[in-house]
Amino acid sequence: MPNLEPAVVVPTSEAIAVDLTKLEEKLAPADSFLDRHLGPGETEQRQMLQTLGFDTLGDLIDQAVPPAIRFPRSLQLPASQSEYGAIAQLKSIASKNQVFRSYIGMGYYDTITPPVIQRNILENPGWYTAYTPYQAEIAQGRLEALLNFQTMVMDLTGLEIANASLLDEGTAAAEAMALSYGVSKSKANAFFVAQDCHPQTIEVIKTRANPLGIEVIVGDHHTFSFSTSIFGALLQYPATDGAVYDYRSFIDKAHQHQALVTLAADPLSLTLLTPPGELGADIAVGSTQRFGIPLGYGGPHAAYFATKAEYQRKMPGRIVGVSKDAHGNPALRLALQTREQHIRRDKATSNICTAQVLLAVMASMYGVYHGSTGLKNIALRIHQLTVLLAIGLKRLNYSLNNDYFFDTLRVGVGEQSAPAILKAAEGRGINLRPLVPGEVGISLDETVTVQDLLDLWQVFAGKDNLPFTPEELWSEVKTSFPADLTRQSLYLQDAVFNQYHSETELLRYLHQLESKDLALNTSMIPLGSCTMKLNATAEMMPVTWPEFGKIHPFAPAGQTEGYQILFAQLEAWLGEITGFDAISLQPNAGSQGEYAGLQVIRQYHLSRGEEQRNICLIPESAHGTNPASAVMCGMQVVPVKCDGEGNIDVEDLTSKAEKYGDRLAALMVTYPSTHGVFEATIGTICDIVHRFGGEVYMDGANMNAQVGLCRPADFGADVCHLNLHKTFCIPHGGGGPGMGPIGVKSHLQAFLPRTSLNSTAELQAEDQSIGMISAAPYGSASILVISWMYIAMMGPQGLTKATEVAILSANYMAKRLENYYPILFRGNNELVAHECILDLRPLKKQAAIEVEDVAKRLMDFGFHAPTVSWPVLGTMMVEPTESESLGELDRFCDAMIAIYQEAQAITHGEIDPADNPLKNAPHTAQSLICGEWNHPYSQEEAAYPAPWTKQFKFWPAVGRINNTYGDRHLVCSCEGMEAYKEG
């Protein structure tokens, strides 16, 4: 009989998906990350638009952004995800990384981050959302932590001065080369690098040396005869293969030939080994990664740089120094800033802006928590385990090819056995380092246990049953250093390293320091050109996942599939956002991005036989890193004028381009301009440069005004760096970390930074890459997850809306303040971009009030000042970002208006011109209640100048700091701070 049952229709997966979408539309709306990221809600946006005279946000954007550069379509990116959904997807990607025990070394080690440090610094917005401590009175906590860092480095290295961190060990070594080149009395043009330095450091050195015309000689320090004149030398201590050498003889010979010597030294080893300063080294560099900082597939980590006092004014990077405030109390500040790029520009010691403050703070607190005894015990334990491992390997008939070592063994295994040993190790979840054929390296760290040694012995034995027990071998364990390389000098004797060893004490110390700093968890930080937007918690959470944090940067590619997926997606997304054909994620700071981009342009010209192209045109308004980076690339800087409206003077640009013709290499331009406007002539500007054979480098500092509205590659840029720590939500960390990846058009793609150390000499000869510009192939890889999360959660519409609201907020503030402070520059239809410049010069003329007075008075209102006196002296540049609510914008505007009124009171003779709230700001709690109050204004006017300060008061920790005194009496260690306190 026929089957009369109705046929069952099975819906297709596509049909089910459509039904689910329809059902989803009927449900109450899900939580939107965009609503969490934006400060002003829809109602507040309408109020702001009404103030500006616009009906819709689209109307404002149409008037503000030049039509010629508008992006004609929506960004083609994945749809936005919820916080929960994005975390789940990223967790799935992370799971594709394989977390092995990596004993590869090369300056990177697994480590133990003390939970009290992870929870209260790395995961604490009170630390990671602060800005570089230019406004020192409200950054005393961070500055003290950095002073601890400097002291720790000076003590461990035995040198007289240290900076507050650099980007990584490789670039720190390159900076040492540059310093040596600048101060050496030798007329030589060659720099010697020992062949047993870390290979990535050698690569970075070569990259840096090339455009400066420096010859890099890589050789054996044992046999180098100094018959070739050199200005400096770099040695690894201990060497990359683990060997510990006494470098005294080499250093003495170098000094006889007027060359400076840099030791790249592992700071943990220096608790046991004679420090570089005592060996005679002029400079010491290295990484503090193993002081509690996760591997993170290469970063971020805080490098250090220490040298002799005579070179302090030539040293790169930030230096924290001790000074005193207006009341005579000790106070900390950034010292010797006249060395730096934001002042010295093309004559600066380096293009480094900020570095790795958050990581330096963590490393310093690792030192504080453990103290000298704790650090020495960690080092001694690692060394003892290494010696124990060596004894066992000898019992297994393997040769050890170094006489002395700290934590790394160079094991002779034979060429035929090496592949099997490496494979056996991999089978047990262990990474070893292949050295020369027939040798492997094993580098131990503080996470290693005796069980790990058993696993290693079994790898080399080829079986589980060993002919010995660890206990049997212990009696043979002895220190493996000669007496003259065993440290005798004391270190970390200052009180701070000897009183916070319980978690309770350290927790309170960290809280005390944090409470002295104003970060985004207190109030807005409206710094122009800095984009201090929300760093959402969901974006930050994955940074500490072990699937990202415990991966060695030179782990086998098969173990890093998750990272490769992350990189590929992020590169594709950034390419779509900017219009560029290729992205390099290697630059680990904006300054590094600038350097990489200009190097790419230089290499492109060289590949075409146009080596004469060395002129870099830079607008007078440009950030100081621009000319500093150009000089580092061997270019000659030629400034271009700006017109009265703050735009690039097209006539002057044309004249300069014609003048230099076939010598023109590049134009560096920021867009929107550093004056806070969309220049309508940007397309014409790019065309002029291209007409004369130059390339256009765009500084991406102001990309937050472009995302979704226009794309730099579309209107003429050939290369651009992106500040992921601005536009794409990586936090500033109080002065780092940052990331500065670059995007390029297809004709420049071949010249991007190299990501492999394993290419042969033949391949490198064919390779057109500029080489490595950071020590790790993907820079500070672990924080790229932050930008991935931001883009994934915002989606294409959300990213565009964020840009629009950032422009709305800036124009709203400009409108509210224009009757009190002239808005110096405006663009299309009298509108600004995402920031605006307030002209404070009338206050100086009328009431003798300086920009500094306003900046310090804002602290009494609970605000960090906008960018001061840049790009125009006597002004403030304000950038509110899209993340600040209307209430917060109004509070800041009210504070600025109140300050204007205080200045007017001086002008009208109502307040003493010398003794007033502006000149005496900031006001500390101590200054209000200790001693007599002899000022002609009340304590309430001083400390509670606005209603919101009575609801919550942020107190500056010190009064106004005497900057001149600090530079004239330079003290850069805790010892100096203690002396001040005693005095």
From Swiss-Prot:
Q: What class of enzyme is it?
A: oxidoreductase
Task: Tell me which EC number(s) this protein carries.
Answer: 1.4.4.2
| Classification via Gene3D superfamilies | Aspartate Aminotransferase, domain 1 (3.90.1150.10), Type I PLP-dependent aspartate aminotransferase-like (Major domain) (3.40.640.10)
GO BP terms, alphabetized: glycine decarboxylation via glycine cleavage system
Cellular component terms per the entry's GO annotation? cytosol; glycine cleavage complex
Q: Which GO MF terms are attached to this record? A: glycine binding; glycine dehydrogenase (decarboxylating) activity; pyridoxal phosphate binding
Q: Which UniProt keywords apply?
A: Oxidoreductase, Pyridoxal phosphate
**Catalytic activity line of the entry:** N(6)-[(R)-lipoyl]-L-lysyl-[glycine-cleavage complex H protein] + glycine + H(+) = N(6)-[(R)-S(8)-aminomethyldihydrolipoyl]-L-lysyl-[glycine-cleavage complex H protein] + CO2
As cofactor, the record names: pyridoxal 5'-phosphate
Identify residues that carry N6-(pyridoxal phosphate)lysine: K726
Family annotation (Pfam families): GcvP2_C, GDC-P
**Family, per the entry?**
Belongs to the GcvP family.
What is this protein for, i.e. what is its function?
The glycine cleavage system catalyzes the degradation of glycine. The P protein binds the alpha-amino group of glycine through its pyridoxal phosphate cofactor; CO(2) is released and the remaining methylamine moiety is then transferred to the lipoamide cofactor of the H protein.
Q: How does it assemble?
A: The glycine cleavage system is composed of four proteins: P, T, L and H.
Name the record gives this protein: Glycine dehydrogenase (decarboxylating)
Q: Gene that codes for this?
A: gcvP
